A protein has these predicted regions:
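Expand to "…catalyze enediolate/carbanion chemistry for C-C bond making/breaking, isomerization
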Residues: 1-167
């Protein structure tokens, strides 16, 4: 989470030197009351990376809560200090909005975690759109817990998402 007390040490590979990439989360790992603090921390982190570049540091992917937050982050004009963004609750319907705000130089990781993912027609259209419009898509992420929720199911406490029907 962007509220982590050792955010700099983690994202620079000091705390975990074998990391190749890391997600800085502003979504579900951050409580609503802590969002502003998380945003301040993230901006400070990116500014510090600008001042102290480290080519050996892990690639950073930012996970905003929504499109509006992503736009706010992009507007800081620090886009060259991180590798990409994880796009939450991504669907064909919001692809255009994402395209309008995201800089061309970053990689994208759309997260499929809404009920639309159960619609084969939607998925076929999304596949085509990603091929042509989102050529910087690094990978697709699956939001397993959210997909289970769409089915009115919950992951058992003592199991991982990979031990459920989604996994």
């Amino acid at each position: 989470p962007a509220t982590h007390e050792q955010l700099w040490e983690v994202t620079e590979g000091i705390k975990f030197p074998i990391l190749k990439s890391i997600a800085v989360c502003l979504e579900d790992a951050v409580l609503e009351k802590d969002v502003q603090t998380a945003m301040v921390n993230l901006k400070h982190l990116l500014q510090k990376r600008l001042e102290q570049p480290n080519l050996k540091a892990p690639a950073i992917f930012i996970r905003p809560r929504n499109i509006e937050m992503a736009k706010h982050i992009v507007d800081w004009d620090l886009n060259h200090t991180y590798s990409g963004m994880i796009l939450p609750k991504f669907t064909l319907h919001d692809l255009k909005q994402w395209m309008d705000i995201l800089p061309l130089n970053i990689n994208l990781m759309p997260t499929l975690e809404t009920k639309e993912i159960f619609d084969m027609g939607h998925n076929m259209e999304l596949n085509q759109a990603l091929k042509y419009d989102f050529h910087k898509t690094l990978c697709l992420r699956i939001g397993g817990n959210d997909l289970l929720s769409c089915l009115h199911l919950r992951r058992p406490k003592n199991s991982t998402i990979y031990q459920t029907p989604v996994g």
